[in-house]
């Protein structure tokens, strides 16, 4: 559990959401990796114990994974009224490789499993209880939180609702649960109240991101009746293969046997298994909103129960036909032991070796030691972000605060060269250093067995803009209509920020000249930094544009410098100092470009779409010679 962070989508969750602020986590859903309730827990743990504390960040999933085992045990007692089945179901889940994996990986799936089996447990308690009503509260809370972790878990709740409605509407099912007909109405009211609470709280919790969720769902793995019926059928079997991996598939026949546990078929129990498994798949098929098999891991606890029952059903059948009837349940225990042995074999000899990664401590320490306080870090691979993020964030903020740049260094895989490094432009990734001379001979320093650091510039830079450029400059409208204001109420750096507000009819472009002429003797790197705050999720906070004017072959030419963002995926958010009004969180960005030799003058331009409002601060511009 204390292995390096970053695998199995942990990297995306942490970079996009986990290291942000709670308000941002709860109001953004541009990527399906945001299991909001789980992400909030991760954010809490990282703020308490540190962003790189793997144990703390994975602790919520571990706790819910352990709690899930206990809830499986309790549900087995309610569903089968057998302690031996409950013990076996507990064993099955405890050694299951998938349950182990998601109980020590910072993703929301162990929470999904816990809340789902908890909802089933409290539904059974409420269904069979004649007087107690206290189960309504945990039922409603667990139902809401299951959806707040993973929105598609609402499909599971629909399946459970159909099962409960069937139980209350079919007289023979009422008899099997010993529910008097006169209590049916009260039971229905209780369940309807819980459902209303879940629906209302889920709607309120997701209301800031409903539109964004729809867009994300459309861009995600979709299964529709018209186009991918075959994929939906494959998903039916993929869920089983996900839960029972490798040789554990041999035990699926016991799962079928468990559905028929007992001296006679318990129809409500069989119906529970079928509705929980197939109703979500049918909804996925109809709506076209689905996901990977792991999205359906709410099935794992229930399948563990029926698999345990299947071991005893098969054991009884074998004992009766082999003359071992006097050795009560010995065969079932042997089957369970065989299952546990195979599961542990997969865990020990396949799963754990597959997640072994180098200790990041050496990498983290070397990045920190080899980076000066005002160096800019270029990190080529998102996999290398996590344990260099704190240093990259700290130095970027120091560069802006001091208005000073002392060097630019790149972190690359050992097998890569600097020519492969890409910046992110509006037209896509661009290899900015490709074709430049002498870069192949740059000296590299080893960070660990897999990564290296290259210093790609000298140590002297030209700081082009003043510390309060936003307020000191003569901004003018270049095109469009709107207004711009210098603010002293919301400031991240210096004394003022710049508010750009375009009219509702036209986008607006602002421009401000950069004072001075800049003779560039050798090919140099442009480094541009800024902070922005937008007020609408759909607003595009365009990065500042650098317009250059230079003389080439006796002709003065004006052109836009090609710059692109670096370290795309490291979301650096900074909270401004508290003011008399609302306190804002700002995104801090940086971009680079290549500046050929010449004598230049420059202009900074800012773009704002119609009807939008953006704040800018921390504008800094540096020129530094390439090594």
Where are the model-predicted features located?
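Membrane-interface transmembrane helices that cradle and orient dolichyl/undecaprenyl
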Residues: 80, 119-138, 146, 168-178, ...
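Hydrophobic, aromatic-rich transmembrane alpha-helices
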Residues: 68-70, 164-175, 245-269
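Catalytic lumenal/periplasmic loop and adjoining terminal transmembrane helix
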Residues: 152, 203, 207, 333-453
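Transmembrane alpha-helix segments characteristic
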Residues: 87, 93-94, 143, 190-199, ...
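Hydrophobic/aromatic-rich transmembrane helices and adjacent perimembrane loops
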Residues: 103, 110-112, 117, 155, ...
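Transmembrane-helix motifs of polytopic, lipid-linked glycan transferases
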Residues: 59-80, 118
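Signature aromatic-anchored transmembrane alpha helix within multi-pass, membrane-resident enzymes
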Residues: 141, 196, 266-267, 305, ...
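Membrane-interface alpha helices of multi-pass inner-membrane proteins
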Residues: 89-90, 135-156, 197
């Amino acid at each position: 559990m204390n292995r390096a962070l970053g695998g199995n989508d942990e990297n995306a969750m942490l970079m996009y959401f986990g290291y942000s602020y709670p308000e941002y986590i709860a109001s953004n859903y541009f990527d399906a990796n945001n299991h909001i309730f789980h992400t909030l827990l991760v954010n809490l743990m990282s703020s308490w114990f540190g962003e790189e504390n793997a144990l703390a960040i994975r602790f919520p999933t571990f706790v819910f994974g352990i709690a899930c085992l206990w809830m499986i045990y309790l549900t087995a007692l309610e569903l089968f009224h057998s302690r031996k089945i409950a013990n076996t179901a507990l064993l099955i889940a405890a050694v299951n490789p998938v349950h182990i994996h998601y109980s020590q990986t910072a993703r929301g799936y162990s929470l999904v499993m816990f809340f789902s089996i908890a909802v089933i447990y409290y539904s059974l308690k409420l269904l069979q209880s004649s007087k107690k009503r206290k189960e309504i509260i945990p039922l409603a809370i667990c139902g809401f939180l299951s959806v707040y972790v993973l929105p598609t878990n609402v499909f599971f709740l629909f399946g459970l609702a159909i099962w409960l409605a069937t139980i209350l509407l079919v007289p023979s099912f009422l008899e099997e649960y010993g529910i008097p007909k006169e209590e049916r109405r009260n039971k229905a009211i209780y369940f309807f109240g819980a459902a209303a609470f879940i629906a209302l709280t889920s709607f309120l919790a997701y209301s800031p991101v409903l539109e964004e969720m729809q867009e994300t769902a459309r861009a995600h793995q979709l299964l529709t009746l018209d186009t991918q019926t075959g994929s939906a059928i494959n998903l039916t079997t993929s869920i089983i293969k996900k839960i029972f991996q490798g040789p554990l598939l041999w035990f699926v026949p016991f799962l079928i046997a468990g559905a028929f546990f007992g001296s006679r078929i318990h129809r409500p129990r069989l119906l529970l298994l079928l509705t929980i498994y197939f109703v979500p798949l049918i909804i996925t098929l109809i709506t076209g909103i689905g996901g990977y098999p792991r999205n359906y891991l709410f099935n794992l606890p229930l399948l563990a129960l029926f698999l345990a029952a299947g071991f005893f059903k098969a054991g009884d059948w074998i004992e009766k036909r082999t003359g071992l009837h006097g050795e009560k349940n010995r065969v079932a225990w042997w089957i369970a032991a065989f299952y546990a042995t195979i599961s542990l074999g997969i865990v020990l000899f396949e799963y754990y070796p597959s997640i072994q990664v180098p200790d990041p401590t050496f990498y983290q320490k070397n990045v920190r030691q080899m980076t000066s306080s005002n160096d800019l870090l270029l990190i080529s691979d998102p996999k290398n972000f996590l344990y260099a993020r704190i240093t990259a964030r700290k130095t970027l903020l120091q560069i802006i605060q001091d208005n000073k740049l002392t060097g630019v260094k790149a972190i690359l895989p050992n097998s890569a060269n600097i020519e492969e490094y890409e910046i992110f432009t509006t037209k896509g990734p661009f290899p900015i250093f490709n074709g430049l001379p002498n870069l192949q001979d740059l000296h590299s320093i080893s960070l660990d067995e897999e990564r290296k650091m290259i210093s790609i510039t000298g140590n002297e830079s030209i700081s082009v803009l003043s510390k309060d450029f936003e307020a000191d400059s003569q901004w003018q409208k270049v095109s469009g209509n709107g207004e711009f204001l210098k603010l002293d109420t919301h400031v991240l750096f210096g004394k003022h920020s710049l508010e750009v507000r375009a009219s509702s009819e036209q986008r607006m472009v602002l421009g401000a000249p950069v004072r001075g002429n800049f003779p560039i003797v050798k090919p140099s790197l442009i480094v541009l930094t800024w902070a922005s705050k937008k007020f609408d999720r759909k607003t595009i906070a365009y990065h500042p544009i650098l317009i250059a004017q230079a003389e080439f072959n006796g002709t003065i030419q004006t052109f836009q410098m090609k710059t692109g963002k670096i370290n795309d995926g490291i979301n650096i958010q900074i909270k401004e100092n508290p003011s008399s009004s609302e306190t804002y969180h700002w995104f801090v960005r940086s971009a680079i470009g290549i500046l050929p030799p010449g004598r230049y003058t420059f202009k900074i331009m800012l773009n704002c779409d119609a009807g939008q409002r953006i704040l800018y601060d921390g504008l800094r511009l540096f020129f530094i010679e390439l090594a």
